[in-house]
Amino acid sequence: MDRRTKIVCTLGPAVASADGILRLVEDGMDVARLNFSHGDHPDHEQNYKWVREAAEKTGRAVGILADLQGPKIRLGRFTDGATVWENGETIRITVDDVEGTHDRVSTTYKNLAKDAKPGDRLLVDDGKVGLVCVSVEGNDVICEVVEGGPVSNNKGVSLPGMDISVPALSEKDIRDLRFALKLGVDFIALSFVRSPADAELVHKIMDEEGRRVPVIAKLEKPEAVTSLEPIVLAFDAVMVARGDLGVEVPLEEVPLVQKRAIQIARENAKPVIVATQMLDSMIENSRPTRAEASDVANAVLDGADAVMLSGETSVGKDPHNVVRTMSRIVRFAETDGRVPDLTHIPRTKRGVISYSARDIAERLNARALVAFTTSGDTAKRVARLHSHLPLLVFTPNEAVRSELALTWGATTFLCPPVSDTDDMMREVDRALLAMPEYNKGDMMVVVAGSPPGVTGNTNMIHVHLLGDDTRIAKL
């Protein structure tokens, strides 16, 4: 059986060519991430075109995710591009626009001198370098280096515990969001989500642009952890972005936040991505550490829909080897491991139908579960149950097919609109009997809505034998 957990790859200089992206798709990339913290609009547009071309050449559904920078606080630029801060040194972080030196560098957060107070921590580059505020002098925050290390242009700064006042969407984010929607991306990821209301800000701009796509909440702030379930309900999917999360909340809490987020997302049929430093050592090395292999496998066994690669594919030495390695780890975890069953009891019609379809298919030892969907909702409700049976999803909507590239286990087929159950079964026969792994007489359990084409109308389970016009059950 094909790998069920999806792989998200961040695009960047290491794969910035038509051939590089085609090879990523062939290696196993399911979703391409355009990181708007780096690159410019022409770069992202070119990568977008290459992904669409690669998907067409391979016949695979490949989603494209635009990841907005969000109100990320960063250092400015250094005259020499980089420097190394040693323990005990005094560094001035200024809100003035200056060319950075070893001792003084600017920040993008213009209220820092107002908000900072002695004792506050400033963590640079996902916490690799640590500073403590000693005093504030005018526009400069005077800091002592308590954890030294290299720093370079535009590195991120986290301010754990500091009450900061930044909007959910910066002016840059709004420009990038409008550009990404016009470009045609399949998902928008919103960084540093703090409240369920943040989703409404994105939806407002989407409505102005006349195009709605799924919005992914990146869980990186303590406020998001506190409001985890309301945020999951307000957004279409979630990403456990462990880099910033691990410096904003105590490091030891991150594994349990990951497990809680996955559990809540599964209960609500929302796709969930686990991200950051999954195979980080492979940016430089040809093999991952044992801890990294365990990390990927545990994300799979927690029930994640997707695992994400960042610098490993965007700037790594051998991005193709990284994707193949991750795919092997995932496959082995899926083959010999087991995802815990959902303890959540469904109380909606669609939820109960999806549970029942899974149970019927497994009890009858069917060859596969088949879902017909116009919105993707039916497929997501079946996928969250993590059946050992293949999940084959038919949709007449190209955008939904791309969206389901992020959903666990979903193998998608684009089909013409169907008008009744007989049409559905003909489409199933046409597609599956052309595949070597399926034969006439194979049993399929089909879950769909009747009449077809009505969003949110999942109300039918149908047991079908491939190539057989006689329906043996309709429940």
Swiss-Prot record:
Signal peptide: none annotated. Disulfide bonds: none annotated. Its cofactor is Mg(2+); K(+). The record marks 218 as: Transition state stabilizer. The keyword Magnesium applies. Mg(2+) binds at residues 220, 244. Pathway: Carbohydrate degradation; glycolysis; pyruvate from D-glyceraldehyde 3-phosphate: step 5/5. Substrate binds at residues 33, 243-244, 276. GO terms for molecular function: ATP binding; kinase activity; magnesium ion binding; potassium ion binding; pyruvate kinase activity. It comes from the Bacteria. K(+) binds at residues 35, 37, 67. Keywords: ATP-binding, Glycolysis, Kinase, Magnesium, Metal-binding, Nucleotide-binding, Potassium, Pyruvate, Transferase. Belongs to the pyruvate kinase family. Homotetramer. This is Pyruvate kinase.
